[in-house]
């Protein structure tokens, strides 16, 4: 999927191992991140949807951009109208095997 960034550049989005590495760091793993992004309430009755959404945006933009980006830079490059498209892209393209694992258990 291709999106246009606020700086005028076009970015082709792909699910890569780098993207999976970024989302792996989220407390609860990718499943919790996707739940939080969808607005599910936590044990205290609060949602973390904006935080989770920005974490996903950072992961996908930073992993597909050619230059290193900070969290803030990556999130600010995304147009508001592209947020739901990006979230849908991630949800549809992360392999089911990864979603079934609560945490990614890498073997050395």
Question: What is the predicted role of each segment?
Answer:
Residues 52-63:
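Short, hydrophobic/amphipathic alpha-helical patches that form generic packing surfaces
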Residues 1-10, 20, 25-45, 63-108:
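Charged interaction scaffolds used for protein-protein
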Residues 48-49:
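A generic short alpha-helical patch detector that favors 3-5-residue windows
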């Amino acid at each position: 999927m291709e999106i246009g960034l606020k700086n005028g550049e076009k970015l082709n989005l792909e699910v890569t191992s780098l993207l999976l590495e970024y989302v792996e760091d989220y407390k609860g793993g990718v499943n919790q991140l996707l739940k939080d992004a969808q607005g599910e309430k936590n044990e205290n009755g609060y949602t973390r949807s904006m935080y989770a959404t920005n974490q996903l945006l950072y992961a996908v933009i930073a992993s597909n951009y050619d230059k290193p980006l900070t969290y803030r830079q990556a999130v600010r490059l995304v147009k508001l109208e592209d947020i739901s498209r990006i979230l849908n892209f991630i949800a549809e393209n992360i392999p089911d095997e990864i979603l079934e694992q609560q945490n990614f258990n890498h073997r050395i």
